[in-house]
């Protein structure tokens, strides 16, 4: 399966990120230019998250053993994070606020149910995942 994400920076630069055959690539899209794609990371799952903040492009991806955070400012750097993203993950969102880091992801737990989880870093340590439905209960309401 190929996944594609478009990202526009505050400098009006447009980037295409995509997954293909175990790797994540990015390509700058520019008028009248054919820029070759660059492989960012290999041996990863097809679930990844991309965002732009303070002049940097960030990419969160998952290998068999770790989550990996990549950062771009004219050059890609990566850092292994001390947690894994479940193989059953179907969607992923990563965010920062002041000095906190958290990510939200969905996991299909059986044929009919998909659940949202949140995981965050507190005091330089990753907390255990929390089911969002356990934080924000809607009860048995059908409305």
Q: What is the predicted function of each stretch?
A:
Residues 1-143:
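Extracellular, repeat-based ectodomains that mediate carbohydrate processing or recognition
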